[in-house]
UniProtKB/Swiss-Prot annotation:
Name this polypeptide is given: Pleiotropic ABC efflux transporter of multiple drugs CDR1
UniProt source species: Candida albicans (strain SC5314 / ATCC MYA-2876) (Yeast)
Impact reported for M667A: Leads to selective drug-sensitivity
Gene behind the chain: CDR1
Mutagenesis or variant effect for W629L: Leads to selective drug-sensitivity
CC annotations in GO: cell surface; extracellular vesicle; membrane; plasma membrane
Length: 1501
């Protein structure tokens, strides 16, 4: 925390100065005029004398009041609160007082300013202008146009800078914010509020600041701030990004530790300080009860959305920044909490001299009254800056009218909306209209002249002062030992690493599934793989299998870290945020993540290698074993650091996985086993030299074979008729054998087969360690200097054809969202208060198809009770809630964050998936809910969950086609969609894509689309809305509420949760259901005019009277103790249960049940159907939507294409035109084997897109009964097949022809039929890849776990397919795995199709030289052997026989159980495996993901 210093001596001087100033004024004028502006200026000038800055109080009374207040606090060190007998300083006490605590801290700092060195910082700027690159390529790239778009953008990037490429986001503006002043930034979304805050916080990566701009932070430049004081000027973004599996307490304590100052007080250790500070902010923002609850996110259960927002606020507050820029920080907070947050900022500003700025979209009058300064922005122009109390008066003098009951903030913002502002009578032609006219008026005003004068004085003052040195001293005093004074960080690099390691262990503790799964998976794979090579013999027959086992061991250790790339992308946005807060260096986090992974890596290595080494029967020697394990560990480290480096330099997971896989393929092929070193092609030999895995493999082979003698397992010739032949006339077939010798030296074998030597063993360990250190340095450097994602102005994306139409349509207008750039700037829709007028409901009513459905049914509930099990404890979330929603009424559902509002909506709409409804009834017209209930309602969720690749119109049509009655024609549904687009004023962006944040719809547009998706379904019963105004500006929130009012007026029943209703918005609701903590009802009844009925109820039962100027919503939250820091006088749940109003509610529910149940029910069979559309229609629409999603995701498709092309070409050219000798046949077999390597990456690329579809379906579409689970899963499976066939075809051509397999079909003139079959096999493999990925994801929650499972299954398939070990080698209990392995049949089919029916010609070094007995020719000696063993011989000049073990490729195929006659059978079996995958995907998805039955269990009374 920061502060300014003022000694008691200075305080007395100020008091004396004030009294002197007053007396001199009276003396000279002889008349008392009160405390006027002149006096105020004198006081401020005096204050500057003492503090080198302007004092925050504008009056002597305020200053004296401040001095009095400071005398009330003890000024003690509060961090060891257990030893202080003052509950107001103890954050764990119910009597904790945040304001008292802050005052005490200020007094503590002032008690020893030389030690604490409190600091403060203001900002002033002149001619501030921000501009960005205009992006004309605002169409969504697809597979067909993505490359062209990339090329054109690249060309434009290298063009010389010219003004046409840029547009101004912020026009020239001036302002000054002094320490102690709280400033609010007002403007509609897109006005430039976020850009202004980012500019002040020096967070400008992605846009530029004009050269003419002058910015100073009390004498410090923006460069100084960015380089040395980054954590003292922060920008808190609107989004909440946290590690979901960390608890709230751990999240905040981590931030507190990293900003713990060195000068925190004598005897206070860091941990005590950090825990105390975290507790203080948890208590301040009402988070103490969530200390041990996970933060969570949209998909991981945790605290509520409002509480998560408060966690973000608390985390930013703990940074202790002097200048804090808050961007829409109150989004998702209830009105009382939002007010409390602004009060906390005010307290910090007034007492600790901080300089907070906050852009706020919904600001109550109570909140506005707390602000000192206000900035009003209009399309990038500053149209006012000054005292908040003067702004309203300034614009009223200009000629604008402020309506009654409209808050000042709403009035100021409404001036930037032409449809909402209203000039005073007689000023219609005098007031400015455009943003430029407003700015011109402002810059010609006396207020602006006064401002420029003050700014000029401030700049002169900054030049004269020694702030730079004073501020540096204060900064250095806070820094821990071993921290560079110029560093922006508070703690040293090694402390950052230490805290990062501790946090990562807490993350693992919060979600141990991935490390446990990884270790368990390694153990299982160790057992499986080692059992394949179980107990290898000590003969030459084990040479190949010993090498294969070592090869697999190296690969498994090397690539066990591949999935670490995925976790990097999860953490990246959080690390970038913390870097901007100056909590830690990204490099410190990178090192911490590596250190914290060490125990997991060691556990994984032990679980695999200990089992594998001894079961395979590698060399039983302690020294040899520990060398093996040492090399394996370093191999894991090298590859982990390499994969992390790839992830650090990539911008997306698919972009990282593709090069990682190609690299993996290169390393596998050039390890030295697949292609032995002597057989590598000359052009590619260098790859082996830079391959760290190759060095590991060589050392491990040397470690295993050097100095050992192996018994020969096979002689040539041998068998019947050769029993009595002398060893001198036989030779061992193993490489390195010596004629006549029964033993083969392992050293000679390595030298002959691989050119491996013992002298390289320890050298290679050093090289491997060098690689590990090198890649670690690369990784740390990349994370440190990577600037992260560039900020982009919001642009709206259209399809290319739609964009041209849109540009033609809006060419005449170029107004609107200035932050959005040229394209979005053309979206000029109006959010006027009367946005939805009656004409829109009636203008098309005559057609019949677009009439809004009338509703005559009443939904009500009684004694609804819901509980969940949290850590073996049953916790009641809703406690006997009663209520109803009648047609034509809007019922507001309110309560503090976490009170159970969303849970109640989920229970009422039958959307709960966890927990149990233990009691209560939900009835429609007195009848229990039937199967069509969910289809009869609309549910507008708080999260705007949409597919980013669909357009607005497509999303609405998809909902209409599947949710409206199947009897309604397509044209009528399309007409209704157009009607809703017009109704919600989405015409300008109806053909825009949803997109992602920054490139797509903005928050307001997404909310309108969410509402629209439900409206086009024509919900006949009622409409639920969960926080529909969250994140919207006041005008848009108002227009949404007016829209709800119009819907209700046309018979719709609406139940709506709302957080921050102004008095105006509250007036739009008819009834209120208010929940207090624990899901208990505090009130259900009419609101009355100006909420008077509700106010009367609470005042009747003992509440303090509601002030006339108070917002009833905020007052009510205070009364029931739902606002942070407030305490209820009584339990209002008990008050409600004992009230006459409660009895009236119960009687009304009983009356409705009795009366309504007598009404006739709708007996239309179609009305009772679970889904409106038939299954075939659901399937077709879902499949097409998924195909379109992939087509509009060119990054995914091109990553897939790049992967298969690069992998296939690399594979094909590594084995280019493989010869038909013995090594060549083995190379061709391994080429087929390597062809499967991209499997893992293809699955990992696909999973995120499957998850996106599944999230949209399970979160929104399944509960709404849009379409069935079977249509969803069938559509996902079907839509992937065309793309897999396409990439399979590309892979076939890139691999089949370079490898030269077609040459093997030439002798039998079967090139075409064998080529066609090979194409079918290759494409079938790619289809199998997709179905296997979907199978693994069908029942998995996390994509990481599905990817791990797919890797496990893939490894098993590779291991048991017969390439590395055939059925004659496998232990008996694994034969079943060979038989039921799809890759067995695929490999057999591909090998037989590619290699069959041609001749073998041995290379010179492959011949075995045999000397026949004296007097015998080679023919007579070897012909009997060749007849049963195969092969051929050549007679050499010296009479010896050069024997080749094979003469036909069919002999080789037979040795690997691949028969040409079975090729079509094997293809058919592989297709059957694809079908099995599809069937299992459907079954497992139904078992694991489809809700069955209901969550209702009634207690028997």
């Amino acid at each position: 925390m920061s502060d300014s210093k003022m000694s008691s001596q200075d305080e007395s001087k100020l008091e004396k100065a004030i009294s002197q100033d007053s007396s001199s004024e009276n003396h000279s004028i002889n008349e008392y005029h009160g405390f006027d502006a002149h006096t105020s200026e004198n006081i401020q000038n005096l204050a500057r004398t003492f503090t080198h800055d302007s004092f925050k109080d504008d009056s002597s009374a305020g200053l004296l009041k401040y001095l009095t207040h400071m005398s009330e606090v003890p000024g003690v060190n509060p961090y060891e609160h257990e030893e202080i007998n003052n509950d107001q300083l103890n954050p764990d006490s119910e009597n904790f007082n945040a304001k008292f605590w802050v005052k005490n801290l200020r007094k503590l700092f002032e008690s020893d300013p030389e030690y604490y060195k409190p600091s403060k910082l203001g900002i002033g700027y002149r001619n501030l202008r921000a501009y960005g690159v205009a992006n004309d390529s605002d169409y969504q790239p697809t597979v067909t146009n993505a490359l062209w778009k990339l090329a054109t953008e690249g060309f434009r990037h290298f063009q010389k800078d010219d003004d046409s490429r840029y547009f101004d986001i912020l026009k020239s503006m001036d302002a000054i914010m002094r320490p102690g002043e709280l400033t609010v930034v007002l403007g509609r979304p897109g006005a430039g509020c976020s850009t202004l805050l980012k500019t002040i916080a020096v967070n400008t990566y992605g846009f530029h600041i004009g050269k003419e701009s002058q910015i100073t932070y009390d004498g410090l430049s923006p460069h100084d701030i960015e380089r040395h004081y980054r954590g003292d000027v922060i920008y808190s973004a609107e989004t909440d990004v946290h590690f979901p599996h960390l608890s709230v307490g751990d999240t905040l304590e981590f931030a507190a530790r990293l900003r713990t100052p060195q000068n925190r007080g004598e005897g206070i250790d860091r941990e005590t300080y950090a825990k105390h500070m975290a507790s203080v902010y948890m208590a301040t923002y009402g988070l103490s009860h969530t200390r041990n609850t996970n933060v969570g996110n949209d998909f991981v259960r945790g605290v509520s959305g409002g509480e998560r927002k408060r966690v973000s606020i608390a985390e930013a507050s703990l940074s202790g920044a002097n200048i804090q820029c808050w961007d829409n920080a109150t989004r998702g907070l209830d009105s009382a909490t939002a007010l409390e947050f602004i009060r906390a900022l005010k307290t910090s500003a007034v007492i600790l001299d901080t300089t907070p700025l906050i852009a706020i979209y919904q600001c109550s009058q109570d909140a506005y009254d707390l602000f000192d300064k206000v900035v009003v922005l209009y399309e990038g122009y500053q149209i006012f800056f000054g005292k908040a109390t003067k702004a309203k008066e300034y614009f009223e003098k200009m000629g604008w009218k402020c309506p009654q009951r409209q808050t000042t903030a709403d009035f100021l913002t409404s001036l930037t909306n032409p449809a909402e502002r209203e000039p005073l009578p007689g000023y219609e032609d005098k007031v400015p209209r455009t943003a430029q006219e407003f700015e011109t008026y402002w810059k010609n005003s006396p207020e602006y002249a006064e401002l420029t004068k003050e700014i000029d004085e401030y700049f002169v003052e900054c030049e004269r002062s020694n702030t730079r040195e004073t501020y540096r001293e204060s900064h250095v005093a806070k820094q821990s030992n071993n921290t560079r004074p110029a560093s922006p960080y508070t703690v040293s690099f090694f402390m950052q690493v230490r805290y990062g390691v501790a946090r990562n262990f807490l993350r693992m503790k919060g979600d141990p599934s991935i490390p446990i799964f990884s270790v368990f998976g390694q153990l299982v794979m160790g057992l499986i793989l080692s059992s394949v090579f179980y107990n290898l013999s000590q003969t030459t027959g084990s040479f190949y299998y010993r090498g294969a086992a070592m090869f697999f061991a190296v690969l498994f250790n090397a690539f066990s870290s591949l999935l670490e790339i995925m976790s990097l992308f999860e953490a990246r946005p959080i690390v970038e945020k913390h870097k901007k807060y100056a909590l830690y260096r990204p490099s410190a986090d990178a090192l911490a993540s590596i250190i914290s992974e060490l125990p997991v890596k060691l556990a994984m290595s032990m679980s695999f290698n200990f089992v594998f080494y001894f079961m395979v029967n590698f060399r039983r020697n302690p020294g040899r074993f520990f060398f093996y394990w040492l090399m394996c560990i370093w191999c894991t480290f090298v590859m982990s650091h390499l994969f992390r480096s790839i992830g650090a330099v990539s911008t997306s997971i698919s972009g990282a996985m593709t090069p990682a896989t190609v690299l993996l393929l290169a390393m596998v092929i050039y390890t030295g086993f697949v292609i032995p070193t002597p057989s590598m092609l000359g052009w590619s030999r260098w790859i082996n030299y830079i391959n760290p895995v190759g060095y590991v493999f060589e050392s491990l082979m040397v470690n295993e074979f050097h100095g050992r003698e192996f018994q020969c397992a096979q002689y040539v010739p041998s068998g019947p008729g050769y029993e009595n032949i002398s060893r001198s006339n036989q030779v061992c077939t193993a490489v390195g054998s010596v004629p006549g010798n029964e033993m083969v030296s392992g050293t000679n074998y390595l030298a002959g087969a691989y050119q491996y030597y013992n002298s390289h063993k320890w050298r290679n360990l050093g090289i491997t360690i060098g690689f590990a250190v090198f890649f670690l340095a690369i990784y740390i450097a990349l994370t440190e200097f990577n600037k992260g994602a560039m900020q982009k102005g919001e642009i709206v994306l259209f399809l290319k054809g739609s964009l041209k139409k849109h540009k033609r349509k809006t060419a005449a207008s170029n107004k609107g969202d200035i932050e959005a750039g040229p394209v979005a700037g053309k979206l000029d829709y109006q959010d006027e208060a009367e946005a939805v007028n009656n004409e829109k409901f009636t203008e098309k009513g005559s057609t019949g198809s677009v009439d809004f459905p009338e509703n005559r049914e009443i939904f009500f509930w009684r004694d609804l009770t819901y509980q969940v099990k949290i850590k073996k404890e049953d916790r009641v979330i809703l406690d006997h809630v009663d209520g109803w929603v009648k047609p034509g009424q809007i019922t507001a559902l309110m309560g503090a964050s976490g009170a159970g509002k969303t849970t109640l909506l989920n229970c009422l709409s039958e959307r709960v998936t966890t927990g149990i409804i233990t009691d209560g009834e939900r009835l429609v017209n007195g009848h229990a809910l039937d199967s069509s209930f969910q289809r009869s309602i609309g549910y507008v969720q708080q999260q705007d969950v949409h597919l980013e690749t669909t357009t607005v119109r497509e999303a609405l049509q998809f909902s209409a086609y599947l949710r409206q009655s199947n009897k309604i024609s397509k044209k009528e549904k399309d007409d209704y969609v157009d009607y809703v687009i017009d109704l919600l004023e989405m015409t300008d962006y109806a053909d825009a894509l949803v997109g992602v944040a920054g490139e797509g719809l903005n928050v307001e547009q997404r909310k309108r689309l969410t509402i629209g998706v439900e409206l086009v379904a024509k919900p006949k019963l009622l409409l639920f809305l969960d926080e529909p105004t969250s994140g919207l500006d006041s005008q848009t929130a108002w227009s949404i509420c007016k829209l709800m009012r119009k819907l209700a007026d046309h018979g719709q029943a609406i139940l709506c949760t709302i957080h921050q209703p102004s008095a105006l918005i509250m007036a739009e609701f008819d009834r209120l259901l208010f929940l207090q903590k624990g899901g208990r009802t505090a009130y259900f009844g009419e609101l009355g005019e100006n909420c008077q009925t509700m106010i009367n109820y609470f005042e009747k039962y003992g509440a303090d009277p509601c002030p006339k100027e108070a917002n009833p919503a905020e007052w009510m939250l205070q009364v029931v103790g739902a606002a942070p820091g407030s305490h209820a006088k009584q339990d209002y749940f008990e008050v409600w249960r004992n009230s006459s109003e409660y009895q009236a509610v119960r009687e009304e529910i009983n009356r409705m049940e009795a009366e309504l149940s007598k009404l006739p029910r709708d007996n239309d069979p179609e009305a009772l159907l679970k889904y409106a559309a038939p299954l075939w229609k659901q399937y077709l629409l879902v499949s097409w939507r998924t195909i379109v999603q992939d087509w509009r995701s060119p990054g995914y498709i091109y990553s897939k294409i790049f992967l298969v092309v690069s992998a296939a070409l690399f594979n094909g050219f590594s084995f280019f035109k493989a010869k038909n000798n013995m090594q060549g046949l083995q190379n061709q077999m391994f080429s087929v084997f390597m062809f499967f390597i991209p499997f893992n990456t293809l699955v990992q690329q696909m999973l995120p897109y499957f998850v996106k579809q599944r999230d949209v379906y399970e979160v929104r579409e399944a509960p709404s009964r849009t379409f069935s689970w079977f249509a969803f899963i069938a559509g996902q499976i079907t839509s992937e097949i065309p793309y897999q066939v396409a990439v399979g075809t590309i892979a076939f051509f890139c691999w089949y022809y370079p490898l030269g397999l077609y040459n093997n079909a030439t002798p039998t003139d079967s090139v075409n039929p064998r080529g066609v079959l090979m194409w079918m096999l290759v494409t079938a493999f790619y289809v199998y890849t997709a179905t296997m990925g979907q199978l693994c994801m069908s029942f998995s929650e996390l994509a990481d776990n599905a990817a791990n499972l797919a890797t496990l299954l893939f490894t098993m398939c590779l291991n048991f397919c017969g390439v590395l070990a055939g059925p004659d080698v496998l232990p008996g209990f694994w034969i079943f795995m060979y038989r039921c392995n799809p890759f067995t049949y695929l490999v057999q089919a591909m090998l037989s199709t590619g290699l069959a029916n041609t001749f073998v010609k041995c290379a010179e070094r492959e011949y075995v030289s045999v000397k026949p007995p004296n007097g015998e020719s080679c023919s007579t000696y070897l012909d009997p052997y060749i007849k049963f063993a195969g092969g051929y011989f050549e007679t050499r000049n010296d009479g010896s026989c050069a024997f080749c073990q094979m003469s036909s490729t069919n002999t080789f195929l037979k040795s690997v159980n691949s028969l040409y006659s079975e090729r079509w059978r094997n293809f058919g079996i592989f297709i059957a495996f694809i079908a099995i995958n599809i069937i299992l995907t459907v079954i497992f998805y139904w078992l694991a993901r489809v809700p069955k039955g209901n969550r209702e269990k009634k207690n028997k009374k």
